[in-house]
Amino acid sequence: MLNDLYHMLDPVAISAGPITIYWYGLAYVVGALLTAVVMYRTQRRWGFDITVDDLTSVVVGVVFGLIIGARLFYVIFYGDGYYWAHPLEIFATNEGGMSFHGGLVGGIIGGVLVCRMYKLDAWTIADLAVIGAPLALCLGRCANFVNGELWGKPTDLPWGVIFGGTAGDMPRHPSQLYEAFLEGIVLFCILQVLSRKKPLLPQGTFMGVFVMGYGIVRFLIEFVRVPDAQLGYLLGGVITMGQLLSLPLVIAGLALIIFARRRNQPQRIYLAA
């Protein structure tokens, strides 16, 4: 059934004359909007009142930082020298090649810069952002599935999908959907439950849970996901680049949770004048 569904899907969502809109691009836009809505509703539930203009500025800053960071990390860590020989290809984002780890770093930098401009507390803003971010991750992974990219290893399970092309004609794990469910829906539910705890959890807690949760899921999913062809397995064939980049996230996330608990700084939207 899942295999039949995949072959019914088209990477192009809308095509009208010279205008072509892909599901992958829509995933970014809708994901950003959903994250903004969750941020706004959560901060209202927490008793705060961020202005729509300030929230919009934060989201725009994060999205720009995310896209730049995601692309640069892919070029540096996954390009295997290709982009140094073809520098103009760095800007060909329509051909794919984005890294979550770079997107996380770039998004944080973009968000912090905007927070400084508008005197927003970056810790609380980051916590609010990651509460809704799993929805964007879920949509992004679903778009990966529609595009037939980042597929898994061969499997004889009934939900295996024949992606064709370079993936061949054998059924494979739909690893994109595994990630959509675990790092998307499951992580979103966990963060939603935590966001409703009283009293509010201290600044940095949600960011720590998100980073650690993603790192754990990504590290485990890599066992059933085919590594990037240009890199394969690293360190003697025991680990993938995705796992190598995810291990620090698990450690950093756990450290951030411990730090947040010891710091015990209450949530706030705006910095004191």
What is the meaning of each model-derived region?
Residues 1-273:
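Hydrophobic, membrane-interfacing alpha helices
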